[in-house]
Amino acid sequence: MSNHTHHLKFKTLKRAWKASKYFIVGLSCLYKFNLKSLVQTALTTLAMITLTSLVITALIYISVGNAKAKPTSKPTIQQTQRPQNHTSPLFTEHNYKSTHTSIQSTTLSQLLNIDTTRGTTYSHPTDETQNRKIKSQSTLPATRQPPINPSGSNPPENHQDHNNSQTLPYVPCSTCEGNLACSSLCQIGLERAPSRAPTITLKKAPKPKTTKKPTKTTIHHRTSPEAKLQPKNNTAAPQQGILSSPEHHTNQSTTQI
């Protein structure tokens, strides 16, 4: 349809241009015949016609350029975009586990907050407190420091109660006289009484003492070579010869000569 309308507009402009040509030729003929008044009126009308035609053509070309620049059909954004709250029909096991764990963590945190608000009563039994201690130790890591007593001396640390939401001071039962709150605190205090962990001292094994054995002193006697050659079953006479000095042997040898 747009091409057909442009073709019709082009035909009308062409016809108007031809008519203006014929009009100019007629005005020139009248000017030759000295008809000035008629020529002036005709020129003014021709000028008005040309101006209007130029304005019309300019508007047509501007409209055609804008129509070519703009797309004919705008894309719909709602068809391409998905809704934000869209839930997939397939509910996988991983999603179920993640939601289940998140629900458990929120319920445990709510229970711990309820425990902190019950700072003075503690009407629930001890089994529930122990179960909550175990759950809190398995899920929520705590980074709280032990409370400081007003006297300035800190109680010994109990390594089992690091993850508790609140630690209670030890209250002796002798001070409670008819107070239910004090008796409950006394019972919990007895359960939570700070017990010092046994200190393990590593004793070093004593080194074995090394005693030096006394060495036997051996006395070496000088003996002559003649005494070594004599047999063992000799009588006392040869033993005297063994113990005799070498000077005695030299004297005997001289007498024999």
From Swiss-Prot:
Site annotation Cleavage: residues: G65, N66
Ranges facing Extracellular side: 67-257
Biological source species: Bovine respiratory syncytial virus (strain Rb94)
GO biological process, one term: virion attachment to host cell
Glycosylation sites noted in the Swiss-Prot or TrEMBL record: T72, T80, N85, T87, T92, S105, T139, N163, T199, T215, N233, N251, S253
Record's protein name: Major surface glycoprotein G
Disulfide bonding pattern of the chain: C173-C186, C176-C182
Region span, Binding to host heparan sulfate: 187-198
